[in-house]
């Protein structure tokens, strides 16, 4: 199956909708303490810079590795990657600016807040 067909199947199977920050998502769990979503970025998409108010953990599921851009001050940033070198999780602390970009055709991750 081609990458385009995999992306289409993931969106349809999980009933994903466009996310305001870019990409597609579906909420799969929510209670008073935690929320978890599946989040999908294609190669032409990115999750735009935004500042989070709660600590968020990203979990890699499939596709190409994902670059995570973070900044404490909104000016200097660093890049981490999940989905390669046995690194499948990354936590972004509350108050941090961050953005996401797939390194290939697509990246499917989970986000837990």
Regions found by a protein language model. Name each.
Residues 2-91, 99, 104-107, 111-113:
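Non-catalytic, conserved peripheral segments adjacent to functional cores
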């Amino acid at each position: 199956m081609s990458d385009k067909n995999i992306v289409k199947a993931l969106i349809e199977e999980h009933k994903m909708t466009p996310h305001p920050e870019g990409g597609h998502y579906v909420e799969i769990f929510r209670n008073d303490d935690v929320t978890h979503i599946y989040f999908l970025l294609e190669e032409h998409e990115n999750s735009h810079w935004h500042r989070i108010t709660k600590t968020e953990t990203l979990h890699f599921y499939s596709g190409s590795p994902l670059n995570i851009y973070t900044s404490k001050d909104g000016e200097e940033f660093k890049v981490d990657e999940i989905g390669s070198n046995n690194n499948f999780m990354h936590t972004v602390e509350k108050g941090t600016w961050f953005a996401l970009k797939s390194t290939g055709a697509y990246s499917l991750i989970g986000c837990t807040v």
